[in-house]
A protein has these predicted regions:
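Rhodanese-like catalytic fold shared by cysteine-dependent sulfurtransferases
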Residues: 2-6, 17-51, 59-92, 101-137
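Short, surface-exposed ligand- or partner-binding patches at beta-edge/loop junctions that are enriched
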Residues: 96
Length: 137
């Protein structure tokens, strides 16, 4: 048993490092928080769209229908891109990318800039397609 314990501990630590975003979870970060949303929940939200919908993936890998803007995740805080965003920092903004990682980074950046109603599509376009919804290529 003593020989197995270090391997078991290592397996637990490694599996924790590969965690995926929890859908519906509010993600607390240094300057505030953003919320992860599932593909199914986003599809429901799209029926009464009351948000700015932004693809932050780079390079281009497709779009979800009704996307409002495409801004590279690492350029979302640049003044010419900020000028495309709502002036109201409480406006709802939903971000997505291919897998969810770039949109998490962009969500954190927008929260650090004072935006308070940021949503992230957990799993990105991959999750969207896996849920049976289409992508415009």
């Amino acid at each position: 048993m003593k020989k197995i314990f270090p391997f078991l501990l290592a397996a637990i630590v490694l599996s924790a490092c590969q965690s995926k975003p929890v859908v519906g979870e509010t993600v607390a970060i240094e300057d505030g928080s953003y919320r992860n949303v599932s593909a199914q929940e986003l599809n429901t939200m799209m029926k009464e769209k009351d948000f700015v919908f932004i693809n932050v993936h780079t390079p281009f890998a497709g779009l979800i229908t009704d996307t409002d803007l495409s801004i590279p995740y690492d350029e979302i805080g640049v003044p010419e891109n900020l000028s495309q965003l709502p002036i109201d920092k409480n406006a709802k903004i939903v971000l997505y990318c291919r897998s969810g990682r770039m949109s998490e980074i962009a969500a954190s950046e927008l929260v650090s800039l004072g935006y308070t109603n940021i949503w992230n599509l957990a799993g990105g376009m991959v999750a969207w397609e896996q849920a049976g919804y289409g992508i415009e290529k």
